[in-house]
């Protein structure tokens, strides 16, 4: 197969940052995707519909003039103090589509995250009543729990009790990384879904250490053993409608990654579709890429599927060693390496 044409896809988990960083990266996503669920973990975080409206305008202003149409789908950052009334405003807004749960301290800019779900129960109950999805960074932050086990422990100790309390809450497990998460979603009712990144389909934790410490392969949740990567790939390419594309593309300046205490996050927006195509091709499931990239997400979010198309061609190209990022540079996933697929045109 030399070309592959897909209904124009969406990215259901994206970090666009703000200011100069936003201006540097927005066009990459707009080139490949019609829409994206935009993460709210700015400094300060986006916690209200009013703040989300202002951020949405900044995103639209950062898109290159004359470029492809791109719709940012906004989210709010759930805090211990998010009132149920804000959920009503979300449901009425037409442009805020979900709330994001960051356990406090779990990832980049998560200090304002939730310290106890029990304190959020009235707000979560209102979300369940109105059908507003909760997007979950599914890791516990207890320092006694091994970093490689934090997703599995989260499912057992946080997510399952929450769903026992609120069984109709619509939940997206973001960037799943473990066999346990894949099995949980496959066995769960239709109100539970998951996004999957290209790196968690393509790489295991060896990629962090091959030839030395590889900071540009460090993200959270961290890459796992090969058995988990393989389980994720099997689930995603199985034909289940409960898994959909979410890059978690997360730009950081090169100096912030190559540091004594480097930031977590992998930038993949420059080549997201080629990376996913490689993963699906490796699994012998290219015929299932379109549903994962273009159908399952809008169906879960109760949004119309896109009508345009994008075409990939199977032609090798070399990923640049770095990309401009304001006054700095960033190192993209597969920097300096060869990819098999690229966007046509």
Swiss-Prot record:
Active site, per annotation: 248
Catalytic activity entry: (S)-dihydroorotate + H2O = N-carbamoyl-L-aspartate + H(+)
EC numbers: 3.5.2.3
Entry keyword annotation includes S-adenosyl-L-methionine: no
Statement: the UniProt record of this protein carries the keyword Hydrolase: yes
Top-level taxon in the UniProt lineage: Bacteria
Pfam families named among the record's database cross-references: Amidohydro_1
UniProt binding sites for Zn(2+) 2: 100, 137, 175
Binding site for substrate: 15-17, 41, 137, 220, 252, 264
Top EC group: hydrolase
Annotated InterPro entries: Amidohydro-rel, DHOdimr, Dihydroorotase_CS, Metal_Hydrolase
Free-text cofactor note: Binds 2 Zn(2+) ions per subunit.
Coiled coil segments of this chain: none
Sequence positions that bind Zn(2+) 1: 13, 15, 100, 248
Keyword vocabulary terms for this entry: Hydrolase, Metal-binding, Pyrimidine biosynthesis, Zinc
Biological process annotations from GO: 'de novo' pyrimidine nucleobase biosynthetic process; 'de novo' UMP biosynthetic process
One GO CC term on file: cytoplasm
Function: Catalyzes the reversible cyclization of carbamoyl aspartate to dihydroorotate.
Family: Belongs to the metallo-dependent hydrolases superfamily. DHOase family. Class II DHOase subfamily.
Subunit structure: Homodimer.
Protein name per Swiss-Prot or TrEMBL: Dihydroorotase
Organism: Laribacter hongkongensis (strain HLHK9)
């Amino acid at each position: 197969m030399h070309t592959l044409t897909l209904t124009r896809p969406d990215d259901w988990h994206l970090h666009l940052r703000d200011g100069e960083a936003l201006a540097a990266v927005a066009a990459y996503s707009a080139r490949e995707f019609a829409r994206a669920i935009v993460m709210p973990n700015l400094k300060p975080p986006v916690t209200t519909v009013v703040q989300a409206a202002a951020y949405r305008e900044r995103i639209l202003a950062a898109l290159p003039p004359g470029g492809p149409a791109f719709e940012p789908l906004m989210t709010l950052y759930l805090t211990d103090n998010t009132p149920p009334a804000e959920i009503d405003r979300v449901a009425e807004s037409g442009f805020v589509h979900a709330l994001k749960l960051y356990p406090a301290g779990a990832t980049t800019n998560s200090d304002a995250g939730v310290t106890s779900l029990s304190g959020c129960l009235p707000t979560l109950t209102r979300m369940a009543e109105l059908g507003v999805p909760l997007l979950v960074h599914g890791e516990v932050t207890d320092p006694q729990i091994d970093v490689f086990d934090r997703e599995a422990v989260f499912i057992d100790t946080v997510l399952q009790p929450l769903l026992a309390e609120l069984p109709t809450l619509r939940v997206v497990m973001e960037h799943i990384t473990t066999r346990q998460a894949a099995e949980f979603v496959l066995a769960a009712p239709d109100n539970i879904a998951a996004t999957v990144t290209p790196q968690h389909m393509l790489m295991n934790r060896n990629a962090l250490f091959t030839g030395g410490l590889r900071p540009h392969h460090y993200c959270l949740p961290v890459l796992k053993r090969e058995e988990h990567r393989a389980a994720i790939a099997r689930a995603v390419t199985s034909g289940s409608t409960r898994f959909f594309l979410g890059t978690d593309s997360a730009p950081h300046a090169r100096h912030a990654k190559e540091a004594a205490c480097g930031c977590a996050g992998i930038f993949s927006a420059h080549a997201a579709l080629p990376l996913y195509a490689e993963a699906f091709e490796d699994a012998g499931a290219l015929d299932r890429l379109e549903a994962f990239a273009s159908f399952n997400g809008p169906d879960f979010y109760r949004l119309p599927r896109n009508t345009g198309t994008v075409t990939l061609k199977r032609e090798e190209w070399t990923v640049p060693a770095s990309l401009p990022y304001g006054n700095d540079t960033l190192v993209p996933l597969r920097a300096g390496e060869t990819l098999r697929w690229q966007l046509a045109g």
